[in-house]
A protein has these predicted regions:
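Two-component system phosphorelay core
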Residues: 1-133
Length: 133
């Protein structure tokens, strides 16, 4: 499976750039209008959306249920800039809409990507100053 958004790609010097973060923080900053407190709140909400929908995805028993959770994961991921997770969900969503069977390996890929994103969020929240005023 070719990656649409590779984590690394050679630049003009032939050297690969640093690995991409699980969340594009520039995109998130733009979405939160540059408000660091709002960024953290968005990350907290996104973390819960991902947690719940990955769990429901793993428990889903029908293709429509799987599609609904994939679509939610993809949409939420695009909103915060979690491009890798969005890509995994998008690929599986397209395959299912094209008539493929539910692929357990793709669900595992989504779970692994979600765990990476959630760990990144936990680190960001733990390291953040208190913005409550």
């Amino acid at each position: 499976m070719a990656a649409q958004f590779p984590a690394q790609s050679p630049n003009q010097t032939g050297l690969a750039p640093a690995p991409r973060l699980p969340i594009d923080m520039l995109h998130l900053a733009k979405q939160a209008l540059g408000d660091p407190g709002l960024e953290l709140e968005v990350l907290r909400l996104f973390d819960e959306v991902v947690r719940v929908n990955v769990l429901r995805l793993e428990e889903a028993t029908s293709a429509p249920d799987v599609l609904r959770h994939l679509h939610t994961i993809r949409g939420a991921s695009v909103g915060v800039g979690a491009w890798g997770l969005a890509q995994h969900a998008h690929i599986m969503e397209v395959e299912l809409r094209d008539g493929a069977e539910v692929n357990v390996e793709h669900i595992q890929d989504i779970r692994i990507s979600a765990e990476e994103v959630r760990a990144f969020i936990a680190e960001r929240i733990a390291a953040a100053p208190d913005y409550a005023d």
